[in-house]
A protein has these predicted regions:
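Amphipathic alpha-helical assembly/interaction segments
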Residues: 1-145
Length: 145
């Protein structure tokens, strides 16, 4: 059974809260040069600027994909598939964020414990998105009937 367009509203799902925590965490890391006080040589500064831009772009993409997926209210299999593609892209973007963070940590030799909360937020985001996709599988069976 579908929801009338006039009565639709955005879901207040948990991953939106996690999303903004993750985005704030990335912004803080970029703002503070990944807390690598005094460790930055000139070549590392260039690397850090490049990786910072990449991380900010990935975070923007993540917000974009989640907003797209959350704005699709599937009423047929095609819409369900569109939503699933956006969810998949969001999950892939989370893994790209993790990879970029790991590259920065390895390159600048920053201890893991400085990023623990941010890494946990990314992992929570991935798990929430996967749970959302799993719950959408039930919707697919309803749409297929």
């Amino acid at each position: 059974m579908s929801v009338v367009k006039s009565k639709r509203n955005k879901s207040g799902v948990e991953f939106e809260m996690i999303l903004f925590q993750l985005a704030d965490g990335v912004d803080n890391l970029v703002e503070h040069d990944f807390y690598a006080e005094g460790m930055l040589a000139v070549k590392n500064k260039m690397f850090l600027e490049m990786r910072s831009r990449a991380l900010e772009e990935l975070t923007d993409k993540l917000v974009f994909y989640i907003k797209i997926a959350n704005s699709i209210y599937p009423q047929c299999i095609t819409e369900w598939e569109e939503r699933r593609v956006a969810q998949g892209k969001a999950i892939g973007t989370c893994y790209a964020i993790l990879t970029n963070m790991q590259r920065i940590m390895m390159r600048l030799r920053i201890p893991d414990n400085k990023y623990t909360l941010d890494i946990q937020n990314v992992m929570r985001m991935i798990n929430s998105l996967k749970a959302w996709r799993k719950s959408d599988n039930k919707l697919k069976t309803k749409l297929g009937q």
